[in-house]
């Protein structure tokens, strides 16, 4: 019985040490996206495209895209493949959200219909790619859902800065998507600390 009493805390301590080591080992990618021929460095999606060869748990919590003052908020939303997005209508008028394709595949087109203020429509994005959000009622509205293969992603601020946290150590390929620029890929090696990268997106 004494051996059991002594061993149990040792097992627990070892498990805690391993868990702590795993948490400490996670790194982060801090970067900046420069642009050429594009009016703004804001709202550019940056995500790990390859290198994380595993299946990820889909978040139970839904991501919310609001419709406010005749705009999609946020304009660009990145989600892990399989995530459900709730499209909320905060405007006093009805909206009809649809996308004509996902990355050019018209078979993935979808129309959510029209709904009034205060209500929301959910949709689960199971296909990788980019859905260009439009509104049948208000043609001036536009937004984007970028469906990524990993949960390691970010959207640039107005100065082009971004930060991707809690990335396991490894060799990865970063990829960008922007409304007006061509995609850019760059390899990055992530360790236990922070790694800095700089990307240039051209029209």
What are these regions (language model features)?
Residues 24-203:
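Extracytoplasmic copper-binding redox domains, predominantly the cupredoxin/blue-copper superfamily
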Residues 9-19:
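Bacterial N-terminal signal peptides
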């Amino acid at each position: 019985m004494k051996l059991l009493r002594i061993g149990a805390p040792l097992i627990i301590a070892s498990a805690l040490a391993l868990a702590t080591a795993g948490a400490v080992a996670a790194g982060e990618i801090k970067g900046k996206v420069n642009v050429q021929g594009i009016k703004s460095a804001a709202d550019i999606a940056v995500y790990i495209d390859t290198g994380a060869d595993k299946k990820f748990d889909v978040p139970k919590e839904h991501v919310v895209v609001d419709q406010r003052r005749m705009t999609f908020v946020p304009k660009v939303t990145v989600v892990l493949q399989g995530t459900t997005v709730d499209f909320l209508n905060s405007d006093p008028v009805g909206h009809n959200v649809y996308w004509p394709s996902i990355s050019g595949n018209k078979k993935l087109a979808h129309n959510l219909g029209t709904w009034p203020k205060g209500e929301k429509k959910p949709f689960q994005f199971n296909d990788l790619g980019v859905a260009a959000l439009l509104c049948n009622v208000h043609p001036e509205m536009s937004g984007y859902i970028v469906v990524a293969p990993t949960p390691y992603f970010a959207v640039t601020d107005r100065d082009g800065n971004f930060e991707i946290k809690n990335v396991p150590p490894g060799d990865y390929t970063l990829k960008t998507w922007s409304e007006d620029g061509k995609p850019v890929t760059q390899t990055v090696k992530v360790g236990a600390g922070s790694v800095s990268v700089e990307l240039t997106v051209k029209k």
